[in-house]
């Protein structure tokens, strides 16, 4: 079963960044995705991490990476969407994806396009996320 959770503890955030090959930045936020047992009381394995920054007009998904040996792009997309939803509910209008932080295929599945400077207007996105083309 998939679990996606924010990482509040900075030490754990740093450890999971290291595990997934993401740069640790103390001022960034992060979510992790994990495979958990049926009642969600035990982590079977870490799937990946998503680090992001929310500061004024500088709202960026910095990293979206899988743990070594894990190939679950669907879980990465779900985790990134959870981060985007959190940002939207926090009042963020636009979010940019750092293209160095994930692969192009995953970025496109999330709706980020180079032609749009890898930026999504979250208000427009959440009007119809399955039809978002802007």
Where are these regions (language model features)?
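Short amphipathic alpha-helix that is part of the acyltransferase structural core
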Residues: 1-26, 131-134
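Short loop/turn microsegments at loop-to-beta-strand junctions
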Residues: 27-31
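Conserved donor-binding loop and adjoining core beta-sheet/short helix segment
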Residues: 35-74
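Conserved acetyl-CoA-binding loop-helix of GNAT-fold acetyltransferases
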Residues: 71-85
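Non-catalytic positions within long, well-ordered alpha-helices that form the structural scaffold/packing
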Residues: 85-88, 108
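Conserved GNAT acetyl-CoA-binding A-motif
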Residues: 87-100
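Conserved active-site alpha-helix within GNAT-family acetyltransferase domains
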Residues: 100-117
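C-terminal "cap" of GNAT-fold acetyltransferases
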Residues: 116-134
């Amino acid at each position: 079963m998939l679990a996606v959770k924010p990482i509040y503890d900075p030490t754990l955030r740093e450890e999971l960044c290291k595990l997934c090959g993401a740069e640790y930045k103390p001022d960034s936020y992060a979510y992790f995705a994990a495979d958990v047992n049926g009642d969600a009381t035990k982590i079977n394995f870490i799937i990946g991490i998503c680090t992001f920054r929310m500061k004024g007009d500088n709202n960026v998904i910095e990293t979206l990476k899988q743990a070594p040996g894990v190939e679950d792009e669907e879980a990465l997309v779900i985790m990134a969407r959870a981060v985007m939803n959190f940002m939207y509910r926090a009042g963020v209008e636009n979010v940019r994806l750092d293209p160095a932080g994930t692969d192009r295929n995953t970025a496109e599945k999330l709706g980020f396009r180079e032609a749009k400077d890898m930026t999504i207007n979250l208000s427009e996105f959440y009007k119809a996320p399955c039809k978002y083309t802007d």
